[in-house]
């Protein structure tokens, strides 16, 4: 019995003019998600999804490539203006932000939403190099 060809679902174009870019930059990777005002994901990308593996995922260049890809996907849905929420301690924060600006978005606000504990869990041990 022959397998049925997998149907490719085309995403319908959502006409959304403004949204929120969530940039989560960890020590190992950078994830960018662009959502509408309610928090529904419109486009997402990460350094790992762009083909970077291992320690290359945590570089600023990988974050830039991921942000450019995510911006292109969001612009296909008609997005023009963004609020940016940056989270995490990673090295890809600024480069992802610059890439979103260079892609032609009007950035209305930049917020740092990195969670800071009020003496919560015990942190990781310090690295000795």
Curated annotation (Swiss-Prot):
For this UniProt record, give its keywords in alphabetical order, as a comma-separated list.
Ribonucleoprotein, Ribosomal protein, RNA-binding, rRNA-binding
Task: Establish whether keyword Protein biosynthesis is in the entry.
Answer: no
**Entry's Gene Ontology molecular function annotations:** rRNA binding; structural constituent of ribosome
User: Which biological processes are named by the entry's GO terms?
Assistant: translation
Its Gene Ontology cellular component terms are: ribonucleoprotein complex; ribosome
Family annotation (PANTHER family): 40S RIBOSOMAL PROTEIN S14/30S RIBOSOMAL PROTEIN S11
Q: What does this protein do?
A: Located on the platform of the 30S subunit, it bridges several disparate RNA helices of the 16S rRNA. Forms part of the Shine-Dalgarno cleft in the 70S ribosome.
Family recorded in the similarity comment? Belongs to the universal ribosomal protein uS11 family.
Subunit architecture:
Part of the 30S ribosomal subunit. Interacts with proteins S7 and S18. Binds to IF-3.
- What protein am I looking at? Small ribosomal subunit protein uS11
């Amino acid at each position: 019995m022959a397998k049925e060809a997998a149907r490719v679902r085309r995403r319908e174009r959502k006409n959304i003019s403004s949204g929120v870019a969530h940039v989560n930059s960890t020590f190992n990777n950078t994830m960018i998600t662009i959502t509408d005002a309610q928090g529904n994901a419109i486009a997402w990308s990460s350094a790992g999804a762009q083909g970077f593996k291992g320690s290359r995922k945590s570089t600023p260049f990988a974050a830039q490539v991921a942000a450019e890809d995510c911006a292109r996907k969001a612009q296909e849905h008609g997005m023009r203006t963004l609020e940016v929420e940056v989270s995490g301690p990673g090295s890809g924060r600024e480069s992802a932000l610059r890439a979103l600006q260079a892609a032609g978005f009007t950035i209305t606000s930049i917020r740092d939403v990195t969670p800071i504990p009020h003496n919560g869990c015990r942190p990781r041990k310090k690295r000795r190099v």
